[in-house]
From Swiss-Prot:
It is found in: Cytoplasm. Belongs to the UMP kinase family. Pathway: Pyrimidine metabolism; CTP biosynthesis via de novo pathway; UDP from UMP (UMPK route): step 1/1. NCBIfam families: pyrH_bact (TIGR02075). It is an enzyme of class 2 (transferase). Homohexamer. GO terms for biological process: 'de novo' CTP biosynthetic process; UDP biosynthetic process. Its main location: cytoplasm. This is Uridylate kinase.
Length: 242
């Protein structure tokens, strides 16, 4: 049996990933499919998986701010949206027999644990999935930054950035059929070229803490397992090129 390349990972899911074709709300079939891919790598390889979910399928803080809403208030609403998504994913995982804990950066003890770093690591060591909800708990910080921050805190080996495209391109492949895909990038290139893989805060945090990032297409079944096994799919973003 092939051996996995990574033991502890942070999986970053956009809120839109849970919405499926509709683009808004939560599609239970899509959530179940994602949960199935996560369960597969845990049952087969014992991978320690932490998840960060966005909230854009329910609410976008930047959109609310652009329409005149107070930015901090709009961002807090977005954080609550991530909690809704996290509970949906927790439910799907537990139906597959995977013990799952949701930890929120804003306390809401009736439905989830507060974020405690040492407890999160202990859960992972016991084979539980930990879903980090409510962003960093602070407005003005994206869920991409949450993924970078939590990856650094729990000493994850890699961030798996699940997208609707199969990697990083020099322009939007959904709009430009001639867009060129990168197999490998340095973080400084991402920043200098404004490639939009993550926002600049998240990118800088990954760069400063030497956390590699793999951008891959979530919509291809089995891709999470392929990434874990080190197959050459997607785009890897890291320090200096080999």
């Amino acid at each position: 049996m092939p051996s996995p390349k990574y033991k502890r990972v942070v999986l970053k899911l956009s809120g839109e990933a849970l919405a499926g074709e509709k683009g808004y709300g939560i599609d239970p079939e899509v959530v179940n499919s994602i949960a199935g891919q996560i369960a597969e790598i845990i049952k087969e390889f014992g991978i320690q998986v932490a998840v960060v979910v966005g909230g854009g399928n329910i609410w976008r803080g930047l959109s609310g701010s652009a329409k005149g809403m107070d930015r901090a208030t709009a961002d807090y609403m977005g954080m609550l949206a991530t909690v809704i998504n996290s509970l949906a994913l927790q439910d799907a995982l537990e139906k597959l027999g995977i013990d799952t804990r949701v930890q929120t950066a804003i306390e809401m003890r009736q439905i989830a644990e507060p974020y405690i770093r040492r407890r999160a690591i202990r859960h992972l060591e016991k084979g539980r999935v930990v879903i980090f909800a409510a962003g960093t708990g602070n407005p003005y910080f994206s869920t991409d930054t949450t993924a970078a921050l939590r990856a650094a805190e729990i000493e994850a080996e890699v961030i798996l950035m699940a997208k609707r495209v199969d990697g990083v391109y020099d322009s939007d492949p959904l709009k430009n059929p001639n867009a060129q895909k990168f197999d490998e990038l340095e973080y400084i290139e991402v920043l200098n070229r404004g490639l939009g893989v993550m926002d600049s805060t998240a990118t800088s945090l990954c760069m400063d803490n030497n956390i590699p990032l793999i951008v891959f297409n979530l919509e291809v079944p089995g891709n999470i397992k392929r990434v874990i096994l080190g197959e050459n799919i997607g785009t890897i973003v890291g320090g200096e090129r080999k």
